[in-house]
Amino acid sequence: MKSILPLLLFLSIFSIYGQTTTVEYWLQARMNGVYELENGSSVQFWGYGDNTPPNPGNKVFLPGPQLRFKVEDSAVVHFKNNSPEMHTIHFHGLDVNQANDGVGHTSQDIAPNQTFDYRFKCTNEGTFLYHCHVLTTLHLAMGMYGTVVVGPSNGSSSLSTGLPNYDSEYLMLSSEFDLDWNTNPISPGPFHLFEANYSMINGLSGTQLQNGDHDILGNVNSFIAIRLANIGYGRTKFDFPSNLTVVAYLSDGRLLPSPIQASSFDLYPGERFDLLVSSDQIIDDLVAVSYYDLRNDNQTGSNFVPIKIGNNALTSIDANGLQFWPNPVQGVLYCNNPSNQSVLFQVYALDGKLIQEGNIQPGLNTLQLELLAGMYMMKTPQSLLKFIFD
């Protein structure tokens, strides 16, 4: 999957008692975003972008930058309104006081070219949302939203303290456009009826999700964390392959009384589920996402996200007869290709970001990998293998 834009700067302040950590982000609002549709045409959108000093950008993203904290962190979100209209940031599901709730008339609207610092303490693990709460019907529909992830206070790769660690993590944020609104937004109104006609996962739709950059990748007998969230106006149904074990541990930023194992999950507007997904077999399949109108339950769209579970032993021979060694890798990875055809290889980080790619020629190959130390996925047309780079 395409990585969610990381913000570049945070400040950690440890008190003399060793407890308090302040994590800061800088966001801006703009109303000049250009979104490329699946068919190659473009529409306008409004959104949030990185505003980190000393060199803030001038772009907004769909969805907005993901904000990540740990339980007990003191969060500070510095917000600048670089647009001609009022905007706010409302932190949906997070426990914040009224002054920091981002609901205009009960806290404050942020005027054009003005700033505001949102401050709150992170008290619960889970997945949360943020969005503009000025003329919410329009501003949210135009793309002014993003996600917040709060992890365990100990920094572990788990959904919550005491749960198993996961090897990789993915977000599946559902949303929709009514393209008529994006073509001709009217503020403050009147509005015509919102009719969802363009469905997205993480701001992408249709074939945009099928190019290999947005696959959910994992290994046999390992856990994948999948964070489901719905910021749209309809019901979204996520259907997972039946040979996956899918267990929900958190809902709306709270631990469930008992974990829920299921192959499908229905999410209503603003709802979130945090899942651990695993399998004891190799899988190359799709997560089907269906979108429904809340008024009449008519289906308004669908998307499909590839999910691939592979072997975790890099020294094994894959379906093409390729053999890789050694594991861990120290600079050079060797590969023997017994066929007379070249084979594409791709190296992914565990968050799904494509790091390096090339071709494996017939015979013995020496692959020079330019990576930071850590764990990676090697993808070929017929396999998905995990390796460690020292």
Language-model regions, residue ranges each:
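Short strand-edge motifs at loop-to-beta-strand transitions and within beta-strands
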Residues: 65, 114-118, 214, 263, ...
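Glycine-centered tight-turn motifs at strand-turn-strand junctions
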Residues: 354-372, 389
